[in-house]
Amino acid sequence: MPLNRFFSQCCFFLIAGFSAAQSVPNSSSLVLEEIMKGNEFIGHQPENIRWSIDGKKIYFDWNPKNEPGNSTYEFEPALKGSKPILSDPKTILEYDQTQSSYSDQYQIIGGSLTRYDKNSNQFTRIYSTTSDLHSIQRSNDPKTVYFQSGSNIFAYNRGLGNILQLTDFRSGEGSEKKSDSTYLMKQQTELFEFIRDQNERTAWRKSKEIKLFRDVTPFYIGKDQIEQIQVSPNGRFVSFRLSDYPNSAETKVEHHISSKGYTYSSNARAKVGEEEPTHRLGILNMEKDTVYFVDLSKLTDIRKKPEYLNDTLPYSNDRKVVMHSLKFNKSSDQAVCDIRSYDNKDRWIILIDLITGNFTEIERQHDEAWIGGPGISGWNTEEGTLGWLNDNQTVYFQSEKTGYSHIYLYQTSPLIKTIQRTTAFTEGSWEIYNVSLSKDGKYFYVNANRSHLGNRDFLKMEIASRKIFPVMSNEGYHDVSLSPDEKTLAIRFSDKNTPWELYTAVNTANATKTRITYSTTKQFNAYQWRKPEVITFKGSDGKDVYARLYQPQIAQKNTAAVIFVHGAGYLQNAHNYWSNYYREFMFHNLLVDNGFTVLDIDYRASEGYGRDYRTAIYRHMGGRDLQDHLDGKDYLVSLGIDSNRIGIYGGSYGGFITLMAMLSTPGEFPCGAALRSVTDWAHYNHEYTSNILNYPDTDPEAYRKSSPIYFADNLQGKLVMLHGMVDDNVQFQDVVRLSQRFIELHKTNWDLAVFPVEAHGFRESYSWNDE
C-alpha cells in the first residue's frame, strides 16, 4: 500500500472511525514536504561554541548560507558593533581549558607540535613530523610538555630545547634468546682462550663507557592493544591499559544502491552476548625502569553474582572490569581511577599508591539494575565526573546514592581522623550535568535541572561555603562556554519553540543575555510555533510522569489524538528547550492545526528524573515504559479524547514501544507507525542491551518478554513499519524477521515501507517526507 494512502487511512480512522478511508485535507499552513527538510527549512543553528586562546574571540560552527556543511565563524564580544564573520582557518587558535593555569598553551596543529605564549601572543612551531602526534599532557614543570607519537610518550623541554623519548612500547614478545645463549657460542667460549680474552676486553671497554643518557628500555605488550597512555605530572610514572579484545562475530549491512551498480556489504557491530574484553592496568616506574600491573582482585565483591541469577555462590574467577584513565594528584605519587564491572552492576573508585600499586577503595557504587546516570554514564567505557580539587586532598565525583545524580567529595587526608571522609556536596530531587572547576579551584560550574526538571540551568557553586549562585536559570537550556578569564559567557541557548542561538553575558548571578546570531529562515519565522505545555499525569503506580501536551483550540478539536514515543530510552524530550526531534515538533504543530491533540511522554527510562525512573525497565522493556503510554492514553481520555481514536508512533526505541503497544496490548490503539524499530533485543548491540536485560544466555526470559516478535500473533490494529535498509544500528534484519512472522501468521493489516539509502538517522529530506 502506498505510504500516503496508509497515512490518510490512519488519520481518517482517528477522525471518523473505521469506515471506508478517504483522503484527508491538510488544514495547516505548514507543508509536510517543507518541514521535513529539517534545518534547511528551520535554519542551521550555531554549535560547538569555544573561545580563542587570548579570550578575544568566540568561535562556533555555523551554516547561515545553507551550504553543504558548517564552517567556523568568529565573534568579538568586546568590539562594539561586532558581527559574526567567517574565520580564516589559518588564524584559529582555540583555548584549551586543561592548560588554563600555564602561561603558554601547546597544541598539535597539522601534524606539528606548537606553542602559544599567552603573554607575548607569539606562536611557535616546535616539532614537525609525518608521524601521528597526539595527546598533549602538561607537567608540574611549566617548561616541560608531554605528547604521544604512535604508542609512545615523548617530552619536550623548552629550557633545554630538546625532545626525549620516554617509553618504548612494542608489540610482540621480544627476543626469546640472548645472542650468547646458543650451544655453539657457549662451546667456543669454553674451548678457546682467544674468545675468552676477546669477551673480557669487550666487557672492560663497556665498563669504562660514560653514559650521558638513560637508554629507553623496550617493553613488549604481546598481542594486546595499548591504550590510555598517561604521564604523571611529576614525570615519575607512566600509566597504561593493556586490552585483549575478543574476535566477536560482526554483522553485515547490505547496500543495494551504489555508484557501480553492484550490491556490496559493510561490517557493523556485533550482537548482544559477545565475549567481554580483558584489561590490565599497568604502571611504569620511570626512575626504576620497572613495570607492574595493579592487582584488582581485592575489589569489594569482585566475584559476587547478580541477584537475577538466584545463585548465592560466588564466581570462581574475578568478574571482568574496565578501568578508565587515571586522575593524577599533582603533589603526590597518587592517582584515582574509575573502574566498572562489565556486567554493569558495580563501579569502584580507587586511590592508587603509584609506588607500590596498593590501592584504597574510596567509593563503591552497586546497582542490581545497572550503573548509570548523569556524570556517571551507563556506558562502561565512557568516563564520568572524577577529579581532584586544588587542595590535592579532595576527590570529587558523582553518585546516584540518594536517587538523583549529585556531586560528592572524598577527603583523602582528613584533619580529624574520625570525620566522615565522603560527603554530599549537592542534594535534592534534581540532577547535575557537565561539572567543571573554575581556574582558581574555588567554584564548580555545572548544568542542572534544579529550577525545573525540564530546564538546564547554569550554576556557580562555591566549594568552601557550598553556596549555589544561579547564573542562568530561566526557562530553557543554557549551554555555556566560559572565556579564559571566566568573566564572559558564550551561551548556546534555546527554549521550547525557539531553536539554538548564540548569546553572550557577563559572568554574574542572574545575568542578562545578549543575542549574537539570527539563524532561522523567513519560512520558519512566518509560522507561529506553539509552546507545548510541559505537564505531569499520574502513572498507574502513583508516580508523576512528565509529558509535552499539544492541544488545538476547542473549535478545531476533533477528539482524536496521537501519542509520540521518543527514541533512545534514556533521553529527555518533555523539556523546555529545542528538541532533537525538531521535525516531529513541526509535524505535531501540523497535526494540531488539523484538530489532533498530541501527547509526547517522557516515559519510564527517560533521562532527567533520577535513578528509579532510569532503571524502571530493568529486565522488562515494554513493561513499565509501555504502561506509562497506556496511562497517557487514559489522561487524554480525561481531556475529552475518544479512547478509540488515539494512535501511536515513534522511531528506534519509540518504534519498539509502538510495536509493543500494538502487539502486547492488542486493541488499545487502532493504528500505529513503528519507525526503525527493535523487534528482537537478542539482535541488538551489546553495550546498550546488556545493561537492561543482562545476557540472552543467562536471562532469556527478560529477552522474550521484552521482544515484540514474540507477540506477533496478537496484531489487531493497523500497523505500518518503516525502516532504512542500510541501518547499521537497528539493522534491517529486525523488521525483516518480524515481517516473516506476520506472513507465517497470516496477518494482513500491516505494511512495510523500506528506504534503500537510509541508515538509522535519515539524511535525505525526500526520505523524511515519504516516511
Predicted regions and their residues:
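A diffuse structural propensity rather than consistent per-protein peaks
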Residues: 4, 31, 623-624
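Serine-hydrolase catalytic core recognition
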Residues: 470, 477-771
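Poly-acidic low-complexity segments
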Residues: 2, 87-88, 93, 165-168, ...
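Beta-propeller folds
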Residues: 12, 22-469, 475-476, 487-488, ...
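N-terminal signal peptide c-region/cleavage motif recognized by signal peptidases
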Residues: 16-18
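Bacterial N-terminal signal peptides that target proteins for export
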Residues: 1-10
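Disordered, low-complexity tails and leader-like regions
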Residues: 2-3, 74, 567-569
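Generic structural signal for hydrophobic residues
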Residues: 8, 281-282, 458, 587, ...
